[in-house]
């Protein structure tokens, strides 16, 4: 995997970019002026980011794996230490499928009914492969989403959630908070 260098990152026109950021040269970005990227972030091949006016805020120590996408007009926040596994789709906008409206981004807006909302992904959240997160969702700190789940409602802190729609099935250990307290002071000068 080839990564964009510092000059290329600057030329992209992001709202902000931190240190030690590795973005594949095969990832695609739209609305870069609405995208903020923190420190120690890695974005893999074939990811697609399309930020509307709400923007996309990616905090520190984030990995977004191959073929994932973040798309929509609403605000998307990904908090520290979150992990987005491969083929995850996060939508801050969604169309209605009732048939009462047309759908498709090339149809004028007066004929469509697009809903946009915020998506907040808390610290230490992990989203499993192939999952979908819809608008107006909060994944509270430490929530885990199993592979191939569809998240359309909030997930409580330190719960494991699976299914279509995603529902909690168990609690998740908080041991990672102890590890964070040891890791954080030693993390200066990290290399992903």
From Swiss-Prot:
Catalytic activity annotation: dTDP-4-amino-4,6-dideoxy-alpha-D-glucose + acetyl-CoA = dTDP-4-acetamido-4,6-dideoxy-alpha-D-glucose + CoA + H(+)
| InterPro entries, per the entry | Trans_hexapeptide_repeat, Trimer_LpxA-like_sf
Q: Which domain of life is it from?
A: Bacteria
Could you tell me which SUPFAM superfamilies the record lists for this protein?
Trimeric LpxA-like enzymes
EC numbers on record:
2.3.1.209
Q: In which pathway does it act?
A: Bacterial outer membrane biogenesis; lipopolysaccharide biosynthesis
Keywords, in A-Z order? Acyltransferase, Lipopolysaccharide biosynthesis, Transferase
Task: Select a single GO molecular function from the record's annotations and give it.
Answer: acyltransferase activity
Q: Which PANTHER family match?
A: ACETYLTRANSFERASE, CHLORAMPHENICOL ACETYLTRANSFERASE
Q: What does this protein do?
A: Catalyzes the conversion of dTDP-4-amino-4,6-dideoxy-D-glucose (dTDP-D-Qui4N) to dTDP-4-acetamido-4,6-dideoxy-D-glucose (dTDP-D-Qui4NAc).
**Which family is annotated?**
Belongs to the transferase hexapeptide repeat family.
Name the chain's protein.
dTDP-4-amino-4,6-dideoxy-D-glucose acyltransferase
| The species this protein was found in | Escherichia coli
Q: Which gene is annotated as encoding this protein in its UniProt record?
A: vioB
